Amino acid sequence: MGHDIKGFSCAFAVGLLFNILACIVSHSGYPIIVVASYFLAPFPNILCRNRDSFSSEKGTFEDIGLFLTGLFITSGFAIPMILAHSDIISGKALAFSMAGGVTVYATIITFLWFFNRHNDEDNNW
């Protein structure tokens, strides 16, 4: 399991490196704004998930959490597009920023899937 953590950490670092390269290519710090959305995206889901163990229904509060998570993920891709459209960053910086976003979000999703899978196997005794 230790090698898995190292692999996920390396993939996440590569995604952040792409965003740093986007800043270098564009000669501005604007693409680094996207990194804030990477860190803010999981918090609405964590804070708004269903705490009631007796009910399997999703509540309005959980739907709001899912909506806000989607908003942060969408903004992680939309902000570089808006910056490129307004000629604040170049097309190369847009490509680096998008590659970083895809890498980071894919790493987070794979990480959550991988470790939730192990938790499900442990609970089936």
From Swiss-Prot:
Belongs to the OB-RGRP/VPS55 family. GO terms for biological process: late endosome to vacuole transport; late endosome to vacuole transport via multivesicular body sorting pathway; protein transport. One of its GO terms (cellular component) is endosome membrane. It is a multi-pass membrane protein. This is Vacuolar protein sorting-associated protein 55 homolog. The keyword Cell cycle does not apply. Pfam families: Vps55 (PF04133).
